Amino acid sequence: MCIRDSVPEYFRSMCYINQRIKETGAEVVINFYELLTGLTYALFRPSVPYVCIGHQYLFLHNHFEFPRKSVIQLSMLRFFTRMTSLRASRRLALSFRKMESDRTERISVVPPLLRREATAMQPEQGNYIHGYMVNSGFADSVEAFHALHPEIPVHFFWDKQDADEVTKVDATLSFHQIDDVKFLNRMAGCRAYASTAGFESICEAMYLGKPVLMVPAHIEQDCNAYDARQAGAGIIGESFDLESLLRFAGTYVPNREFIRWVRSCERQIIGELERLADQHSAVTVPTLTNYFPI
């Protein structure tokens, strides 16, 4: 067997990352919560500064409040997050709201990164519930709600294998295969949104002024949901209790400050990169207009 073939795949990947940093003449590396990048910097110690971006870095912030969950699971989550950012010059923590920087952990809190398609949407007040489920088994609770309230239109997206593009149960209940364009269009026109607590979709719902029911599927989403609830995004449930969502929707007030916060995204992140450039004079700050909402 060739020695190269016996080297673990992840180690070869780190060698490749390190080599690409050298070959491209990169002035700064931006890491979006990728473990191998953190390990590459720990092992090979490239001289090029790097910045880590992700909502998970808020879990390392001294003032972040965690839900009452397993201490072991929370510790493992924090450990993994730290491993992705070993020797990082700066950690940019995407957040639902403003927070002070944590100098000890080299954390700067910045607005969420939303895709331009989401920020360009014009929200409308519709009459249907929009949702996304990771596990198609949750369809049972959605169908149970529908049996009691057939007059309320419900559109859920899922990734169920072998299902049709649209599974139409009847005139007011449909399950759709994932499609980014259709998903955002449904989000913009819905009455309320139900989903597992993925950070990005919660942010999109908040930006579009939609009340949210969050059903966390794992420890990271538990933390997302807890933080989002504090920011006024919505309520947390153990199942897709759509009746509770509709009750909450009746009193929900959109967070206008969140919209302003998101719109300051480019300015905030460019500012952080400029501060990094001041420390490393060779770094040229890139224009991010094509990536961040203005």
Question: Residues of each region from the PLM?
Answer:
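Short N-terminal targeting/anchoring amphipathic segment
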Residues: 18-34
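A donor-sugar binding/catalytic signature common to diverse glycosyltransferases
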Residues: 28-33, 185-224
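Donor-nucleotide binding loops and adjacent catalytic segments primarily
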Residues: 109, 113-189
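Nucleotide-sugar donor-binding patch of glycosyltransferase catalytic domains
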Residues: 167-168, 211-255
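C-terminal amphipathic helix plus adjacent low-complexity
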Residues: 247-294
